[in-house]
């Protein structure tokens, strides 16, 4: 091509550009104030990576712990500031060019996630439970995550007292994704947030100090099944985009309602196709139900909960359920409210088999972590009853249940870390026989958590179940409530069985010991017990708070 031709093309292009100023690039509008809780966590996570690169190894633990505590506390303070400024009620809105919603459910769920992250963080930082080599204090994580289990590299790292302090920035990255997940206002943001919190969790599951092969197996299972569910979610997103011509929740809802104002010419043949809507919605629902651990998408839960480091299990069991149910609520109430009656039979079936399946299979478990895993599956079914209510009361009841369940879960897994034998944590139920005689306080605390799981009055579990069952009954799901009550009765059997085992069985001579933790784990357990009792004895303030927060912005 000649120089004259090139000049002509350049001149023509310049003329077109100058003649069409409306096509000029517009800088994105980012509301940094409303996004401050997430930004604080992301900045701290990046700083945590720099700490790993430049801070001497012996100083990393305290530096990372301080940085993580400050970041989580600062982010929670930002949440409180936004709530006080009315961003959860009167000033709620859509920010980041439509990608994120800042409203009552967002702030309530983000606050819950941050509180869970703080108490779980203390179990991450615990260094007094496992006897270290040469007097070194070690935590629950592998001395050198990249070494071969049982190899010379691992042995040398253990002798040197190394710890995997990378778990702190990984935790922060996961928290960042969890904060965005329930706030996502379009499908692309939803998928990105899912991957941001999932990838660090895959790594955290693989770095247990004891039983490393089981830990790595759990991580591989979680990764493979998680990738499979992400594929379902992504394919569903593609189908919904073909249906609506947009990834925005509001635009999708408009097309579902038949109030769309503009049709994308490139998607004229697919927009409004009900088959794309139903299949795409079902596939996205599948991806989210995998994250909450609902049947039949629950198969990863017992193996991962059992194999992962127990502090990671506690955090994952609580925080991911909070974020995933928040995302599920927003999808159903904001993007797909027009599909409520179409999805209702499916949601009913999933809730019923989840409640019954989790409760019945838990009876057969002999490992305390697997028992708690199936317990979490049953609780996912109870929470789905509130989701199915399809009412403001249903939303607020789910928010309250998630708050109550989270602290009970983290506290219960914190207690599990204390009961130990020569191989680490003693998770087989037979080893918990007579624990009430050997360590009455620890057994009593664990009994409180088990009674809360069972929904016994005066605990947070009773208040939460009463709220979701009441909302479901008022929403026309009375039969579902009956199934839920029956499932709760079945579940109460195996919870009480553990209590009987601890207090009314003879302790074995070679039974486990109860480690004396640092104030960090003591704080986690104490906070869990306090929240469990407060939400059980005086829940009204928190029920009102959840009710005020239970309004989605569109």
Swiss-Prot record:
NDH-1 shuttles electrons from NADH, via FMN and iron-sulfur (Fe-S) centers, to quinones in the respiratory chain. The immediate electron acceptor for the enzyme in this species is believed to be a menaquinone. Couples the redox reaction to proton translocation (for every two electrons transferred, four hydrogen ions are translocated across the cytoplasmic membrane), and thus conserves the redox energy in a proton gradient. It is an enzyme of class 7 (translocase). GO terms for biological process: ATP synthesis coupled electron transport. The chain crosses the membrane at residues 35-55, 65-85, 105-125, 161-181, 187-207, 222-242, 275-295, 322-342, 345-365, 371-391, 398-418, 442-462, 476-496, 525-545. NDH-1 is composed of 14 different subunits. Subunits NuoA, H, J, K, L, M, N constitute the membrane sector of the complex. It holds the Pfam family Proton_antipo_M. One of its GO terms (cellular component) is plasma membrane. The lineage of its organism: Bacteria, Bacillati, Actinomycetota, Actinomycetes, Kitasatosporales. Its main location: membrane. Keywords: Cell membrane, Membrane, NAD, Quinone, Translocase, Transmembrane, Transmembrane helix, Transport. Its EC number is 7.1.1.-. Belongs to the complex I subunit 2 family. InterPro entries: NADH-Q_OxRdtase_suN/2, ND/Mrp_TM. It catalyses: a quinone + NADH + 5 H(+)(in) = a quinol + NAD(+) + 4 H(+)(out). It is found in: Cell membrane. GO terms for molecular function: NADH dehydrogenase (ubiquinone) activity; NADH:ubiquinone reductase (non-electrogenic) activity; quinone binding. This is NADH-quinone oxidoreductase subunit N 3. It is a multi-pass membrane protein.
